[in-house]
């Protein structure tokens, strides 16, 4: 038996659970005194970012500033030094030497750094209750599950947390990116992971089962027939007859659009 724990199952895994191949249980009870993260989708505005970071700084907290590309981090550092000189930023990304990265993370843990400027390497494994503000640069470039995981880095204490998903002020977003941001903004209550995963499956498709990239048996037999075969196999395994051959109950009908009778002229 294998127990898998996830905040947002990927579409293919979720589809396996919904179709009965895997069992699914939801943990919907939030920790005591946990507050939902307030989420805002906004065009990039230096004034908004300054106010958000200063509010967190003056209440004794810390902030994350996440960019999708390493190339943007140094520019972000210069922007913060010029726009919010009251806070002390530090940079972290996956191409740094291990010792340098460890030093930066240790400084952030010890509250010697106010703002951690990083890529999405911080999306999992961090539990810093004093970090309760998140700024996402170019949030339209992140996937829905990534957005949700990154938002989960804040609000891990008893204080209200705030997430700002910034987009280019002079660029129109494509429909998919706009939909992702709208979904995350609307699902700002606690325990929304399953709802986020369901929306993610709806946007991206469910992998080889229902997505655009179908292959193998699914493509050959079609979605409807494959689902029927899958349901039959699952039912048979649940009944304890996992090794038996699945009976061939299919009666194919062939329609060629022409008469197959012997013509009278031939007789």
Region annotations inferred by a language model:
Residues 178-265:
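C-terminal or mid-to-C-terminal helical accessory/interaction module adjacent to the motor/catalytic core
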């Amino acid at each position: 038996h294998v127990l898998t724990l996830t905040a947002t199952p990927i579409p293919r895994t979720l589809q396996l659970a919904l179709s009965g191949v895997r069992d699914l249980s939801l943990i919907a009870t939030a920790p005591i005194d946990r507050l939902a993260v307030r989420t805002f989708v906004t065009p990039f505005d230096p004034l908004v970012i300054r106010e958000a970071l200063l509010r967190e700084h003056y209440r004794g907290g810390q902030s994350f500033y996440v960019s999708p590309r390493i190339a943007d981090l140094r520019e972000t550092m210069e922007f913060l030094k010029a726009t919010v000189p009251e806070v002390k930023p530090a940079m972290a990304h996956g191409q740094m030497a291990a010792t340098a990265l460890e030093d930066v993370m240790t400084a952030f843990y010890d509250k010697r750094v106010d703002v951690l400027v990083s890529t999405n390497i911080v999306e999992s494994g961090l539990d810093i209750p004093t970090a309760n503000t998140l700024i996402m640069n170019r949030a339209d470039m992140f996937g829905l599950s990534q957005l949700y995981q990154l938002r989960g880095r804040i609000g891990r204490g008893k204080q209200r947390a705030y997430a700002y998903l910034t987009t280019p002020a002079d660029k129109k977003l494509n429909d998919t990116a706009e939909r992702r941001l709208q979904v995350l903004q609307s699902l700002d209550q606690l325990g929304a992971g399953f709802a986020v995963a369901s929306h993610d499956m709806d946007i991206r498709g469910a992998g080889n089962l229902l997505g655009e990239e179908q292959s193998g048996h699914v493509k050959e037999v079609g979605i409807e027939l494959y689902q029927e075969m899958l349901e039959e196999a699952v039912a048979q395994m649940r009944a304890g007859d996992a090794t038996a051959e699945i009976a061939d109950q299919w009666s194919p009908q062939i329609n060629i659009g022409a008469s197959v009778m012997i013509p009278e002229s031939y007789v």
